[in-house]
């Protein structure tokens, strides 16, 4: 075309001396050659150069940690409250540290083994992923409102789908996945420190950090409810390889006690300019709030089909649903709280009694009277959905998700569904496997659990933090 730039002959002509050199002048002219798409995406006006870095300026700030101790003494089975101090202008994250004591058995029964030696009949150890199973419930309270409420199963699901692959192995070590804690020993369950980063909304992005300098009239606290020691400790009888409930008399020093528990908060301290500006300004935040939407006890199956749809409780959900996390949880044992298989873990191993058996073969989702997701193989929810919309595909293939948004990891609005538009009717249609049907006949018990991850609007005004109600059209209603 006549309007296209021309490459001058002198620009590409080369002598014998420079045949191995790049002709910069010629290359620059090649860069200037543009077609339709280049004219669309490369525009000198308001364009960014990649070779002249513009600094995005910020007010000055510094990041500092602070140890937060609970009110009073705390032990297994107790509830501890942490009042969040104002050690900075913003709260970035909170991490729970729990020191676990050593457990030494008081049982002296032995049996002969090949070679003539005597071995203990019993072995003891902590459950795997101890932090998830020891922490029964976590609440973030601001004034009289519970802003976030999470439990063991949500911690299991969130970590599997939303922890970056590069951090996942380290995360498992932090929460008690190391063999030193869960490996069963003849006499001793090892001591150690378990570390649990709390997945609260303000840890998701620095732009959602909790603005303490603006919340001058609000009291902020975190409540942690712990399970009893005998709910997270395993005792195995070698004769029959069964997980037995341990008693205080079985332990040398009697009933065990926690060594210590604390939170470490990460704060940002900003300049006076920012503090003065944000303290005076009203603002709104779009936060994430998980809801426990169902805990449906599965019946004994006489066939491989569940005729009645599993309802999801939308009564307390007030917000736009980003994603659903769901699973069939095996509730057969009082001291195993993170089992999502048919069959039960063999203490001291990574194996499942009877093999790693799936509970479901297909899952469908209905919205109101309509099929929203047809009945699909479970791999759609454990592989394809997290591959497309989460940070990782879970190691545990019996944890499932369905995303209404494009990217669950992004805190910006990227799609959602309003449950009020559905007249609060959302159901799952599941197809149990034969293994699940047999297990229910053999007195294993299961629950279908669902969590809805929702967006909520928050108002920060006159020093107070308020969750806003939303109408079915997304307009702000009265404060809760």
From Swiss-Prot:
The gene is MCP-1. Keywords: Capsid protein, Virion. It is found in: Virion. It comes from Trichoplusia ni ascovirus 2c. The keyword Cell cycle does not apply. The keyword Nucleotide-binding does not apply. It comes from the Viruses. Its main location: virion. One of its GO terms (cellular component) is viral capsid. This is Major capsid protein.
């Amino acid at each position: 075309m006549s309007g296209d730039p021309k490459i001058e002959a002198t620009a590409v002509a080369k002598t014998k001396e420079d045949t191995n050199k790049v002709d910069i002048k010629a290359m620059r002219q090649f860069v200037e050659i543009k077609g339709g798409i280049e004219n669309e995406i490369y525009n000198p006006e308001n364009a960014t150069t990649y070779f002249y870095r513009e600094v995005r300026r910020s007010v000055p700030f510094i990041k500092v940690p602070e140890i937060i101790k609970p009110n009073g003494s705390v032990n297994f089975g107790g509830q501890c409250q942490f009042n969040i101090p104002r050690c900075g202008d913003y709260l970035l994250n909170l991490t729970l540290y729990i020191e676990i004591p050593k457990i030494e058995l008081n049982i002296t029964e032995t049996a002969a083994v090949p070679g003539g030696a005597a071995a203990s009949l019993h072995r003891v150890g902590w459950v795997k992923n101890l932090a998830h199973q020891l922490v029964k419930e976590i609440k973030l309270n601001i004034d009289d409102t519970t802003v976030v409420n999470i439990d063991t199963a949500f911690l299991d699901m969130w970590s599997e789908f939303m922890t970056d692959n590069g951090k996942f192995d380290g995360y498992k070590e932090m929460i008690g996945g190391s063999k030193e804690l869960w490996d069963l020993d003849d006499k001793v369950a090892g001591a150690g420190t378990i570390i649990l980063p709390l997945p609260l909304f303000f840890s998701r992005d620095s732009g959602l950090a909790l603005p303490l300098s603006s919340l001058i009239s609000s009291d902020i606290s975190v409540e942690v409810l712990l399970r009893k020691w005998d709910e997270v400790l395993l005792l195995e009888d070698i004769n029959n390889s069964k997980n037995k409930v341990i008693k205080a008399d079985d332990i040398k020093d009697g009933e065990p006690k926690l060594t210590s528990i604390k939170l470490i908060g990460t704060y940002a301290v900003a300049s006076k300019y920012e503090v003065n500006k944000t303290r005076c300004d009203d603002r709104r935040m779009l936060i994430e709030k998980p809801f426990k939407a169902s805990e449906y006890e599965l019946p004994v199956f006489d066939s491989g089909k569940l005729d009645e749809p599993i309802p999801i409780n939308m009564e307390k959900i007030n917000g736009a649903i980003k994603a659903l996390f769901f699973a069939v949880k095996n509730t057969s044992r009082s001291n195993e709280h993170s089992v999502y298989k048919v069959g039960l873990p063999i203490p001291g191993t990574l194996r499942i009694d009877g093999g790693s058996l799936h509970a479901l073969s297909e899952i469908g989702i209905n919205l109101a009277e309509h099929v929203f997701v047809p009945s699909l193989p479970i791999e759609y929810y454990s592989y394809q959905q997290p591959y497309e919309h989460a940070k990782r595909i879970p190691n545990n293939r019996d944890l499932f998700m369905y995303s209404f948004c494009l990217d669950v990891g992004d805190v910006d609005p990227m799609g959602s569904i309003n449950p009020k538009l559905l007249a609060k009717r959302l159901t799952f249609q599941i197809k149990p496997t034969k293994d699940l049907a047999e297990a229910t006949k053999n007195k294993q018990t299961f629950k279908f659990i669902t969590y809805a991850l929702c967006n909520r609007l928050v108002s920060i005004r006159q020093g107070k933090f308020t969750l806003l109600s939303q109408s079915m059209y997304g307009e702000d209603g009265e404060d809760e």
